[in-house]
Amino acid sequence: MAKVSVLNVAVLENPSPFHSPFRFEISFECNEALADDLEWKIIYVGSAESEEFDQILDSVLVGPVPAGRHMFVFQADAPNPSLIPETDAVGVTVVLITCTYHGQEFIRVGYYVNNEYLSPELRENPPLKPDFSQLQRNILASNPRVTRFHINWDNNMDRLEAIENQDSSLGCGLPLSCTPIKGLGLPSCIPGLLPENSMDCI
């Protein structure tokens, strides 16, 4: 049985300009105290064609975590436009939130992200080189895709066994009929890389 359950992920300040930070309010519950940190990551999928373009926007350590319910706001800077292929700058991609314990990923929450020009003129005649300053980012918050992984909470030597299922506790319908791509359980998408900082539980 998993020692940590994600109760809710709320997408904050959405939609936003492309260069605005990502902000998620994450609520989770620990069935028993965890001696070590949980590591949360926000990953931006730069291209559906290759994981080479994934960007780890931030990584944060939360813990040690006492038993009970906890909430924190996870903020990460927008992706680096220079690392996104020009052909993938406009349109639909994915942002992922992952959590690991002892180096083992046990949950992944993915959202579709639609980047589009607000100006009708730019929509009809987009510039050859994407103008990120004119793009709006809209996260489809009502349709998360949740993938869970069985891990050994007491021994990180065990290998992971991935299972995908519906998380009714997140309070939204999960489109499980969609076709998984590259093992993510995410339609038309993928996952990334970067620094760590420490955050205590609230």
Swiss-Prot record:
Example GO CC term: the record gives: cytosol
Which Cys-Cys disulfides exist here? Answer: none
Q: Which UniProt keywords apply?
A: Chaperone, Chromatin regulator, Cytoplasm, Nucleus, Phosphoprotein, Transcription, Transcription regulation
The UniProt entry, under Gene3D superfamilies, shows: Histone chaperone ASF1-like
The record's listing under Pfam families reads: ASF1_hist_chap (PF04729)
Q: How is it modified after translation?
A: Phosphorylated by TLK1 and TLK2.
Q: Which family does it belong to?
A: Belongs to the ASF1 family.
Name this protein carries in UniProt? Histone chaperone ASF1B
